[in-house]
Every structure is written in C-alpha cells, then in structure tokens.
C-alpha cells in the first residue's frame, strides 16, 4: 500500500455540476456531510494546509463541487453540504441536484467519507447517503467530527453507538471519531484513503465513439 503525501494536495477547480468537471477517470474519494459537519476543516487538517478548502462560519458556503488532486489521477472531492435550513429553496434544489448527479453518474467515485457532528450523528440525510453508497457498492468511512467537544466517556459511547447502528446497512462502513482541532483520527483517515487509492481500480477514460 502506497503512503501518499496529502500535503501535496492542490486545488484543481470548482464546478456547479458534473458537466463542468474534468474527465471522469482515475479515482475520486468524495467528502459529504451536512453543511456544518466540518468537511472543509477535515480536508485542511488531512492536507496540513490551513486554507486548501475554504472554511466558513456560515454553514452552506460550499455550494460547488470542489476538486483537489493528491497525485495524478487521484482526487479528493468536497461536495456541497446538505440539510441546511436557512438557504433559499431554489438554491437548495440546485445543490441537491448537483450532489445527486455527481453521486449517481461519476464513474471515478470509489470511496465516500461521510462527516457528521459526533453530538448529532445519523440524521436522515446522513443515513440516506450511507444507504445510497452501500447500494452502489461504494466503501464508506464515517467520521464523527468535533470529537473534542465531548469528554472521553461520552465520545466512546457515541462511537460505539454509531458503529452498532451502521451494521444495519450491511455494507463496508467504517466509523471513526475525528477532531480537526486535536488532530484526532487523522491517521485513520489517511490510512483509509491510502488503501482506497492503492487497492481500487482506477477508471479508464472513455474514448470518443465508445
């Protein structure tokens, strides 16, 4: 298994929908979660870059599909956050459409990191996201973010509860506690990404006429 250097990750582009993304080949691992789950912070912590992914105090700022390249053909994708109430309905529909299209049609999507606040895990949309990935044979890593907000005992209890709950999905779903602030769980995230990028088969580019 190759240990990739995530500090070399660089921003490639932002796209409103999959039609504006580059060729659908290689391997992509997407980060998904509710608007305040800490996706951008997790990406910045993983790559040890303070501003690779723009963090915001205002949930719902990630409205585009943001693409980052680790090395050639291996990409991380920051998906639009879901489930934030204070967003105009039309805008919300547009994001959800872009999100759904990416999840359903992007062939190079091979792994999904679902982030959820450890204090409020497994909301309906989180469960739908895991269910969809399992049905699509996509491996899932659940990160319970903001783990530093709970004392050790409560953290362990939440972790065990979620691990127990995801068994019902009957899929390849791993659950870890994560804290961008304390750098907890970053090694587990790196290990999982390394295994996905090393072991999953990259998608070949479709040539015109195929």
Swiss-Prot record:
Q: Which cofactor does it need?
A: Mg(2+)
Per the database record, which ranges form the EngB-type G domain?
A: 25-199
Provide the GO MF annotations for this entry. Answer: GTP binding; metal ion binding
Q: Which GO terms describe its biological process?
A: division septum assembly
> Is Lipid metabolism set as a keyword in this record?
no
Q: Which terms in the GO cellular component ontology are assigned?
A: cytosol
**Positions contributing to GTP binding:** 33-40, 60-64, 78-81, 145-148, 178-180
Which CDD domains does the protein's record reference? YihA_EngB
Superkingdom of the organism of origin: Bacteria
Q: Where does Mg(2+) bind?
A: 40, 62
Which keywords label this protein? Cell cycle, Cell division, GTP-binding, Magnesium, Metal-binding, Nucleotide-binding, Septation
Q: What is this protein called?
A: Probable GTP-binding protein EngB
């Amino acid at each position: 298994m190759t240990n990739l250097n995530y500090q070399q990750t660089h921003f490639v582009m932002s796209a409103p929908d999959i039609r504006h993304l580059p060729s659908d080949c290689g391997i992509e691992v997407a980060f998904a979660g509710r608007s305040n789950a800490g996706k951008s912070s997790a990406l910045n912590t993983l790559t040890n870059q303070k501003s690779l992914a723009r963090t915001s105090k205002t949930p719902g700022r990630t409205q585009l599909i943001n693409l980052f390249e680790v090395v050639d053909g291996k990409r991380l994708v920051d998906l639009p956050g879901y489930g934030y109430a204070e967003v105009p309905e039309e805008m919300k529909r547009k994001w959800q459409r872009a999100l759904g299209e990416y999840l359903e049609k992007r062939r190079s999507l091979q792994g999904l990191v679902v982030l959820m606040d450890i204090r409020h895990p497994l909301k309906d949309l989180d469960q739908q996201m895991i269910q969809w990935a399992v049905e699509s044979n996509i491996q899932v890593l659940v990160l319970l973010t903001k783990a530093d907000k709970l004392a050790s005992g409560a953290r362990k209890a939440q972790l065990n509860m979620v691990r127990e709950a995801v068994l019902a999905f009957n899929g390849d779903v791993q659950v870890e506690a994560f804290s961008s602030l304390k750098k907890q769980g970053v090694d587990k995230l790196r290990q999982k990404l390394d295994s996905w990028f090393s072991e999953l088969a990259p998608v070949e580019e479709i040539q015109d006429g195929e």
